[in-house]
């Protein structure tokens, strides 16, 4: 197994060298990669939680009205996802996967933008909870 040089700086050049010498890298993504595609994240200013209060699990379980509201929010978000297109970040990740520099993408997103950018389904792991 080859030895990957250590990342000693935070420059794009250092990162590019690290990826170039890699054959087993994994990329982790979250909401930030999809904001350029028009999908808001949850915690930043202007994000979902700045516009509405999060629903807590115990409230969801205890109150049918809150469950209804939770599902309404989910369906409203799905409408926004339907029109979203992959952006340059998604395409850059897809290029790394397809050039065999990255083996898998682990994402907290369930927007399918990694798959729509060309990352095969079996190389995307969606972890959201």
Please place each PLM-identified region on the residue numbering.
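Conserved catalytic core of sirtuin-type NAD+-dependent deacylases
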Residues: 1-129
């Amino acid at each position: 197994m080859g030895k990957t040089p250590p990342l000693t700086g935070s420059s794009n050049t250092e990162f590019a060298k690290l990826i170039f010498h890699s054959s087993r890298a994994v990329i982790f993504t979250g909401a930030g990669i999809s904001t350029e595609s028009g999908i808001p994240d949850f915690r930043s200013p202007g994000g979902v939680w700045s516009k509405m209060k999060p629903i807590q699990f115990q409230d969801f379980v205890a109150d049918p009205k809150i469950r209804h509201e939770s599902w309404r929010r989910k369906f409203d978000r799905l409408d926004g996802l339907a029109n979203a297109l992959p952006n340059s970040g998604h395409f850059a990740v897809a290029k790394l996967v397809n050039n065999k520099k990255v083996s898998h993408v682990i994402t907290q997103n369930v927007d399918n933008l990694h798959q729509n950018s060309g990352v095969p389904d079996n190389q995307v792991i969606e972890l959201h909870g």
